[in-house]
Curated annotation (Swiss-Prot):
GO MF entry, a single one: structural constituent of ribosome
Keywords, sorted A to Z: Ribonucleoprotein, Ribosomal protein, RNA-binding, rRNA-binding
Entry GO CC: large ribosomal subunit
Keyword Ribonucleoprotein attached: yes
Family: Belongs to the universal ribosomal protein uL10 family.
Organism: Mycolicibacterium vanbaalenii (strain DSM 7251 / JCM 13017 / BCRC 16820 / KCTC 9966 / NRRL B-24157 / PYR-1)
Quaternary structure, from the entry: Part of the ribosomal stalk of the 50S ribosomal subunit. The N-terminus interacts with L11 and the large rRNA to form the base of the stalk. The C-terminus forms an elongated spine to which L12 dimers bind in a sequential fashion forming a multimeric L10(L12)X complex.
Name the record gives this protein: Large ribosomal subunit protein uL10
Keyword Nucleus: no
Gene name per UniProt: rplJ
GO BP: translation
InterPro entries the UniProt entry points to: Ribosomal_uL10, Ribosomal_uL10-like_sf, Ribosomal_uL10_bac, Ribosomal_uL10_bac_type, Ribosomal_uL10_CS_bac
Positions in coiled-coil regions: none
Amino acid sequence: MAKADKATAVAEIAEKFKEATAAVVTEYRGLTVSNLAELRRSLGNSTTYTVAKNTLVKRAAVEAGVEGLDDMFAGPTAIAFINGEPVDAAKAIKKFAKDNKALIVKGGYMDGRALTVGEVERIADLESREVLLSKLAGAMKAKQSQAAALFVAPASQVARLAAALQEKKAAGDSAESAA
């Protein structure tokens, strides 16, 4: 690879690091081209799965200000640059790695820090953003319903008390008139 090509490749990878919301570093040794194509399809349009030389990726990471990933760049390395929802991409990678033992997750990068394999797996185990938001909305709605019931309860108790007093008074008046 010519020096100009290397510089271009480093710049492209650095730009991907800068634009990505997260990145997952994997080892793809033993995967076929069709396996890699299947993985790329499963990741969707918001994730780019890039195979590159470790030295170029290290330089690009330094250029992008990404730290803590150097130990992960050993052996055949590929990086999933996630531009969308990190949970969805992590789930897809975890599922693919489960089905294809040759894919090994080495770690990742998100929110300005390196992630361990365990942290990437925990992200994959999270529910999607939409599910979490709907659960939050449901919890908020339930709390509002409880609050409304709490505010209505004293008024309904007063109304029942007034009705009971009125019945008692009516019963007392009818008892006096009968006597």
